[in-house]
Every structure is written in structure tokens, then in C-alpha cells.
Amino acid sequence: MKIHISLVLGITTALFVLMNNAPAAFSMDDPGFTIKRMVISKDVVDREPVGVGDFFSAATEKVYCFLEAADIETDMQVSIVWYWSNQEMARVTLPIQTSRRWRTYSSKKLVGLKGNWRAELQDSSGIVHNSVNFVVE
């Protein structure tokens, strides 16, 4: 009987340790990192966004969705999904690596498409963790 109880306690303890040390799955509340900044800009220079805005001229050829993440718990991939008038126009997968701070970006050629645009940050399951709206006039 003592062996049986010890075995059950040992298995229970091992499962508890494994479950509490397993990497957290993505959720709306916790993507596995902190989003410090997610902005749309006209350029990225020296890993920093330049010309950040919500409105861009139709003459603007390309914009960037810049992401700064912090406290990344594990290596992962995220996607920046670009929408124009609620129609998906592009999906760019980007790596994010375990780190205190990570900066990355995706660019999108606007090809003169005026109207409402949106860039979404999605995890590998397609869950949206952040979005930025902007207008091309």
C-alpha cells in the first residue's frame, strides 16, 4: 500500500511540475510576450520606425508595420496580416526569438489603394493579439 501511495504521489508531483513549467499557449490575454509598440510608418531606419502616422498620402508607395516585443518567453513565429477594406492583401510570417527585447517589421506596397487599411498581429493559430488601423487618402 505504501508503494502504491508513493507511486501516485510521485506521478502527481511530476505532472504538476511539467504542467507548470510548460510554455503557455497563445491567448488573447497572453501572447507569450509584451507588445511595447506596434505602429505604421513610412520607413524603418536603424530598427526604428520613421514617419509614424494614421493617415498616409496615396502617393506613399510603401508603409511598414513595426513591432517591438519584450519579455519573449520562447522562440515563436507571428504574422502581420495586412487588410484593405477588410480584404486580406498579404500575410507575412516573422520570427520572434526568446529575448528581453525584439524589434521586427513587415512592409506593404500600397499600389495606390485608397481607403481603410489594417495590420493585425496574429499568432500561429490565427488569434489576433493587436491591430493598427490607418487610412490612405
How should each PLM-predicted stretch be described?
Residues 8-20:
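Bacterial N-terminal signal peptides
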Residues 25-60:
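Short, compositionally biased P/S/T/A/G/V-rich stretches that sit at domain boundaries
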Residues 63-70:
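Short edge beta-strand/loop segments characteristic of extracellular beta-sandwich folds
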Residues 66, 101-109:
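Exposed aromatic-hydrophobic patches
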Residues 75, 114-116:
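Extracellular Ig-like/FN3 beta-sandwich strand-entry sites
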Residues 80-84, 121:
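Conserved aromatic beta-strand anchor motif in extracellular beta-sandwich/beta-rich domains
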Residues 89-99:
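Solvent-exposed serine/threonine-rich low-complexity stretches and specific carbohydrate-binding patches
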Residues 96, 109-111, 118-136:
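Short, exposed beta-strand-loop hairpins at the edges of beta-sheets
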